Amino acid sequence: SRISGTSLASPHVAGIAALILHAHPDYKPADVKAALMNSADKLNGDYSVYEVGAGEVDVAEAVHNEMAFKVQDTTIIGDGNGGFIENVYEKGALTFGAVYKKDDSVNTTNRTIVFTNRGTQAKTFDVSAEYSKPIDTVSAHVSDAVANNVTVTTSSASVTVAAGEATNVTATVNIPASAERGQYEGYVNIVNRDNPNEHYRIPFATRFVEKGIEVVEVASPAITTLPWSHPW
């Protein structure tokens, strides 16, 4: 029988994470997450990346693969003293966030992907984008990237990483001003040129929106202004 749900998935993923750490005791949390996500297998059917993430965990690949692909990102958090600081962190997904419409231009934003080769031989990868089909369900609303000429490009379509080295690749989302407002999703596929069976994927998502309100002043008695209460 097939059983689903977070209560079943969580202990399975925790067990797989334990196997990864047993094989790689020096891994940090971001390394474990990247190992789980990079090597995940594509599911049958059409889903939002917010429903299935990178896909189905491949235990053997997650434990034994020699490559890691981590996205560098930032977030603003409260410093506990009434101010804010920029926190830099790594993850296994490309979250481009909200892209605001500009008149008569292509709207872009980018992130850096770090390709790390922990193996003993150099590897060359072909990099391409795969776009999710439009979805309009109760749980997901995904716009048609192909029909709206929305693209995700990388600074190089072919990337060689020397043994024991790391290489930075810039991923950019490009959204024409004429594109439909909405959510665009898909995957960046990374395939070993000499061995297509070695392949990895990074989910991506972005929202194309009209520019919203820049500043809001709230009444303190109604909504707290203490940053440690809502550091976002």
Task: Write out the residue ranges for each language-model feature.
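Short solvent-exposed strand-capping/beta-turn motif centered on an Asx-Ser/Thr pair
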Residues: 104, 115-122, 132, 178, ...
